[in-house]
Amino acid sequence: MTMLTRITTDTSFKQHLRWSPDGKKFLFTRIHEGKMALWTVNADGSEMKRFMPNLDTPHFDGDWSPDGKTILYVHDVLQGTDGKLHIHRVNADGSDSKVVIPNKAFEETPRWAPDGKTFLFVSTRDGNQEIYRADADGSNIKRLTNEIAADNNPCWSPDGKRIAFASHRSGNLEIWSMTADGGDLKKLTDHPAIDFWPAWRPDGKTIAFTSNREGNYEIYLMNADGSNPRNLTHNPAQENFATWSPDGKKLAFISTRDGGSDIYVIAVK
């Protein structure tokens, strides 16, 4: 019997789930009363609250730094009127927000490197969705992918040597991996369904991902080399945005299995 725990019960739309480095909190995007904003909740489901309650413009898709002291997030300053998004960095208490990637285009999906010295992000600055890497202060930007098709959903391996990501480059959405410099491309999934949103387990041996290969979106696991893909959640609901606990023993995700959109945690052997 697989242990499954429901963390939230408010049913509001949620996405972009991230487990904190100390394992005590979740950071996620929530749409509530018509506003898209970052929220936090304790890992036991208590104290759900807006992360930056005084920020009224849309902000979403946050990521904790490895030391838990800062958060990168996407900010739609002009609420879609200019067709651009910024990436900001803010202290974990919500103070001192700064722009690190100005809004040249759609700048999104920031992901800290395991050493906290650089981060990945997705941008359309060169015409389509590509993956870039920048230093922690937003400087020294390097383009890692160069493909006509869209590349997105980047995720670091725990040792910082490789990056898993989703790409349309083979015709349908599959999960690939590359080195931290964009080399040694490897196709990890090969299925006519949609595979995306990879999440590398802290031990480096397993990758969780979302797929609709059995009809609806569910959470799957595969070995880090792409072998042995298997369905973890086995539920007719829609499930996405997997994130690992720091010890790698649990996986959190967002599911509609109880009618709304809530956070669940499942134990993983």
Language model: regions and residue ranges:
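Sequence signature of WD/YWTD-type beta-propeller architectures
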Residues: 1-269
